[in-house]
UniProtKB/Swiss-Prot annotation:
It catalyses: a ribonucleoside 5'-phosphate + H2O = a ribonucleoside + phosphate. It comes from Jannaschia sp. (strain CCS1). It is an enzyme of class 3 (hydrolase). The gene is surE. Keywords: Cytoplasm, Hydrolase, Metal-binding, Nucleotide-binding. This is 5'-nucleotidase SurE.
Length: 263
């Protein structure tokens, strides 16, 4: 199997090393793992692409490239430049430092890479490691992802219709709980949640000595449940969450009532 990996934390992020080890296990003997990751951190850029300027790319070593762009740019670079003659069988994004559960999904460059891979017609899985009191002080906070990542991916790949034919192909969002590997309770297939109290994203203003105003993004505590049988809730409870997703944003539950109202 040929696997392309990327992330949003950058080419030198520890989570990318974790993902490379996982991908090497999945690829198997004779398989290939290729890396095209951002040259600089791209957290929070979502599914953006750099269409207003070129993306510079450099080779960092065998099958290892850094692109000066977003995670979605890296997927495009991997598919249409680095591996243009030998496309990958699977694209993996992560392992993100921090969760991409609930509303975080919508901001995530890790998820953005998986979205672009799916739009390009390839199977893709995003992986993120929740941070919390149960793992932040471990020697390896990515311990849960390291120990369970390959098993989760194999289970997804083996699921019936995992990447069925559809104009908007499925991709998967995997979040590992903020606990030691031995304390992981299992795997749960759940929906995307919304944290109690809503998103904590906001802005804080600072004034520079020259009178210019600077606005800084602010966040909120992450160990907050996201509703019953949803990602952040089961993560906090010690379970790995797996959420099937599509980039189709249509609110189908409202489509017929809108048709009735305006047509």
């Amino acid at each position: 199997m040929r696997i392309l990996i990327t992330n949003d934390d950058g080419i030198n992020a520890p989570g990318l090393d974790v993902l490379h080890t996982i991908a090497t296990d999945i690829a198997g003997p004779g398989g290939e793992v290729w890396t095209v990751a951002p040259a600089f951190e791209q957290s929070g850029v979502g599914h953006c692409i750099s269409y207003t300027h070129p993306t510079m790319i450099s080779e960092f070593g065998p099958r290892r490239f850094a692109a000066e762009g977003s995670p979605a740019d890296c997927v495009l670079a991997g598919l249409h430049d680095v591996l243009k003659d030998t496309p990958p069988d699977l694209i993996l994004s992560g392992v993100n430092k921090g969760n991409n559960s609930a509303e975080n999904t919508l901001y995530s460059g890790t998820i953005g890479a998986a979205i672009e891979a799916a739009i390009q017609g390839l199977p893709s899985i995003a992986l993120s490691q929740y941070y919390g009191p149960g793992n932040i002080s471990l020697d390896n906070p990515f311990e849960a992802a390291s120990a369970h990542g390959a098993d989760v991916i194999r289970k997804i790949l083996a699921a019936p219709g995992a990447f069925e034919s559809h104009p908007y192909k499925l991709f998967y969002n995997v979040n590992f709980p903020p606990v030691a590997a031995a304390d992981v309770k299992g795997i749960r297939a759940v929906g995307q949640g919304f944290r109690e109290g809503g998103t904590g994203m906001g802005m804080r203003a600072d004034m520079a000595p020259n009178g210019r105003k600077f606005l800084w993004i602010t966040g909120s505590p992450q160990n907050v449940p996201s509703g019953a049988d949803t990602d952040a809730t089961v993560n906090i409870d010690g379970y790995i969450s797996v959420t099937p997703m599509r980039a189709d944003l249509t609110a189908y539950d409202q489509l017929q009532s809108l048709k009735d109202a305006i047509e």
